[in-house]
């Protein structure tokens, strides 16, 4: 049982870090410049948040972990909460069933968010964690606004607009669609 848990955690960590973009691209100093307008900054933020979302998540997680390191009880609580998230949400392949009732993933997520917030409040680190996450988000948005997007390779599948940008539609004329007269 313990080996399965450790193996599952290792596989999840490897898949998360494998999905991260190369840190050299993320920190490429030659790609940084001031945006020419607010619209350019907004576009950069949107594209960089989409492209580097795993990198940003890793940074925020590390910052939050460093914040909690000063409170051992908070570390233990968040290990327990992290394991709950892992087993009840991320590692499941089939719906959660308790006493014969199937519980929707949305309900599980809301309960786990409540557990996370409850752990923050009961361990007394909620203000410190909130400040850290706020500061981290501010720094990450600043990074996203200053990092140029010219060198980013973007697939249609990676775009938040997905297939709407595809010009290779099934016999239709791309974005114009397949219209018929009334």
Swiss-Prot record:
GO BP terms in the entry: transport of virus in multicellular host; vesicle-mediated transport
Signal peptide bounds: none
Coiled-coil regions listed in the entry: none
Keyword field: Acetylation, Endosome, Host-virus interaction, Membrane, Transmembrane, Transmembrane helix, Transport
Transmembrane residue ranges: 68-88, 107-127, 129-149
Keyword Lipoprotein part of the UniProt annotation: no
Membrane topology: Multi-pass membrane protein
Record-linked Pfam families: PRA1 (PF03208)
CC annotations in GO: cytoplasm; endoplasmic reticulum; endosome membrane
Official protein name in the record: PRA1 family protein D
Source lineage: Eukaryota, Viridiplantae, Streptophyta, Embryophyta, Tracheophyta
């Amino acid at each position: 049982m313990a080996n399965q848990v450790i193996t599952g955690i290792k596989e999840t960590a490897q898949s998360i870090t494998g999905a991260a973009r190369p840190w050299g691209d993320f920190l490429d100093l030659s790609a940084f410049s001031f945006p020419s307008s607010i619209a350019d900054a907004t576009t950069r933020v949107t594209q960089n948040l989409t492209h580097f979302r795993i990198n940003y998540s890793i940074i925020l997680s590390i910052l939050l972990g460093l914040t909690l390191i000063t409170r051992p009880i908070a570390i233990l609580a968040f290990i327990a909460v992290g394991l709950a998230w892992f087993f009840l949400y991320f590692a499941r392949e089939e719906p959660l069933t308790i006493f014969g009732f199937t519980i929707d993933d949305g309900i599980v997520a809301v309960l786990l968010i409540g557990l996370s917030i409850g752990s923050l409040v009961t361990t007394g680190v909620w203000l410190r964690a909130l400040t850290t996450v706020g500061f981290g988000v501010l720094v990450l948005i600043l990074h996203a606004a200053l990092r140029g997007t010219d060198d980013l390779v973007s697939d249609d599948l990676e775009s938040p607009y997905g297939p709407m940008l595809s010009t290779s539609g099934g016999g239709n004329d791309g974005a114009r669609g397949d219209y018929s007269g009334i």
